[in-house]
Amino acid sequence: MTNKERIEQLIGTRDWGGLTQMLRSLSNMELRRMERVMREEVLPTLENDLFWETLLYIITFKRAAFLSGVVAVRHLAKDGTLNFATESVNRLYEHLRVTNAESIVKMCNMMVPELTSEEQVKGMFEAFHVENEVTRLAVLLKAEHDLSYYLIFKTLKLIEDKVVARKCCMALVKRKDDRAFNAVCLIKAYFGLDDLPARFSLTIEQYELSHIDRNFDTFVHVLEGKRPKI
């Protein structure tokens, strides 16, 4: 039986003591290999509750090795079964809060590019108690998809701070990506930012600004360079 098969068997029976014992028996080289196997082959096969329970135990065993396993959340996000309202998520948050609080934001940074809906992102922030809007913006900037641009815009509207808005724009401009540039155009128009060191082709009329974040589809419509449907 391979190490992967043994791991899958132990996880399937929720034998966490046996899992810990096995991981402790691995050499440094084997543990590094197991980190990849867990992230790429084992965790992506687990249903929501077992996913979070497994992640809790392996991060508790060795945070530095297994924290990145959270990126395997993508299969749950994609099929719509992702749920942060579980006891294992609560316990994982408490464990990180006590042992290494900065890992909470690190984990969110790795997770947010894999999420596919506003509800999922909101659930992540609530479950891991990321309550400060500026911190949320920093996390959202780790993703490079339309959903993150939409939530960045909504968060900036909520806090209404031109300095923060400009910093977000500068971060997006560095991507040299058409979608990111159009997101900057929206932020620039809403906040009246006139000193950004870049040229933009998308123009937004003032009367259109109140419609941009009406819903995600409308926002994406504008990101594509189209006029919002009013």
Regions found by a protein language model. Name each.
Residues 1-183, 187, 192-208:
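Non-catalytic all-alpha helical scaffold/repeat segments
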Residues 209-230:
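Terminal, non-catalytic domain-edge segments
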